[in-house]
């Protein structure tokens, strides 16, 4: 029989295994393009660092979904806790939204800054700067897809050391993502990102399937065939583009499941959706998790 002290110690270990760091602003002062100083005007990053005895040395920036109008916590902190359990340092990105008056390229700028921030502070967080990925669901998946198709090497002459770092992720994880701004898009996400009646040039620029190149990082993509708000064609289009460009990828399409299903579980993650275990297997293949 467990004593009360034993039970408390066990609970303490469980809590410490899922530790959340302090939310931090991506820019020390006002963010570029800020429309004000309210919380929704300040993009942030919240670290979920892996315990020292289970740190794989890899990191993933997580972009929650929400149609570019909100941020779903079950696609943010919950993902970070799951990754943390597997030794990956998760960083949940609070990016600026169309519902607060922001439009492209603000969101992509926030995602790029998040990648640069993790890379710049990699030593402090005991992270390999060559093992930093980005993950997103739904509209967050679109943001992640733009981050892996529109990146740069950084500005070597920048005064801010973070701006000198590359914004290229080393891996992409796209969960039932919005990919295209064309036929199969999610209209709410498109409107929040680009506004009403965007020019064709902008529609093409933000249709990620049109911008996959050889240097797009290896990507894990999954969707359900039953998804109606964001049709599976989005993932099929992106996987086809990855294949054509010769980029390593994994594509998983599951028959059942509503849009926005996430992990379909909560800590301690005993009954997650199969995609989560498929992702762990893929991350081992990429060297993000020890085999």
Q: Which role does the model predict for each range below?
A:
Residues 20-54:
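N-terminal cap/lid segment of alpha/beta-hydrolase-fold proteins
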Residues 29, 161, 177-211, 217:
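Mobile cap/lid helix-loop segments that gate and shape the active-site cleft of serine hydrolases
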Residues 37, 46-48, 222, 232, ...:
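C-terminal catalytic histidine-bearing segment of alpha/beta-hydrolase fold enzymes
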Residues 56-65:
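Short beta-strand element of the alpha/beta-hydrolase
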Residues 64-69, 225:
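Active-site glycine-rich loops that stabilize anionic/oxyanionic intermediates
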Residues 72-73, 77-78, 93-129, 267-272:
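Catalytic nucleophile-loop/oxyanion-hole region of alpha/beta-hydrolase
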Residues 113-186, 203-204:
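Primarily recognizes the serine-hydrolase "nucleophile elbow" in alpha/beta-hydrolase
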Residues 221-223, 227:
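Short beta-strand/loop motif that positions the catalytic acidic residue
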């Amino acid at each position: 029989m467990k004593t009360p002290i034993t039970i408390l110690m066990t609970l303490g270990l469980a809590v410490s295994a899922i530790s959340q760091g302090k939310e931090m602003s991506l820019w020390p002062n006002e963010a570029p393009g800020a429309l004000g100083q309210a919380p929704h005007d300040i993009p942030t990053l919240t670290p979920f660092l892996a315990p020292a005895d289970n740190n794989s040395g890899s990191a993933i920036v997580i972009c929650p979904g929400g149609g570019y109008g909100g941020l779903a916590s079950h696609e943010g902190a919950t993902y970070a806790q799951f990754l943390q359990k597997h030794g990956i340092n998760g960083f949940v990105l609070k990016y600026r939204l169309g519902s607060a008056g922001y439009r492209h390229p603000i969101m992509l700028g926030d995602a790029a800054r998040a990648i640069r921030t993790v890379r710049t502070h990699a030593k402090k967080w005991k992270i390999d700067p060559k093992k930093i990925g980005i993950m997103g669901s739904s509209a967050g998946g679109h943001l992640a897809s733009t981050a892996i198709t529109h990146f740069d090497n950084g500005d070597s002459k920048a005064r801010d050391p973070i701006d000198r770092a590359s914004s290229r992720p080393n891996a992409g994880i796209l969960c039932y993502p919005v990919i295209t701004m064309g036929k199969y898009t999610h209209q709410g996400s498109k409107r929040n990102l680009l506004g009403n009646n965007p020019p064709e040039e902008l529609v093409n620029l933000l249709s990620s399937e049109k911008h996959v190149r050889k240097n797009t990082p290896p990507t894990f993509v999954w969707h359900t065939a039953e998804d109606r708000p964001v049709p599976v064609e989005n993932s099929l289009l992106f996987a086809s583009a990855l294949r054509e460009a010769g980029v390593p990828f994994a594509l998983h399409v599951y028959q059942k499941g509503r849009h926005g299903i996430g992990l379909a579980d909560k800590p301690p993650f005993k009954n997650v959706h199969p995609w989560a275990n498929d992702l762990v297997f893929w991350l081992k293949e990429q060297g993000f998790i020890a085999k």
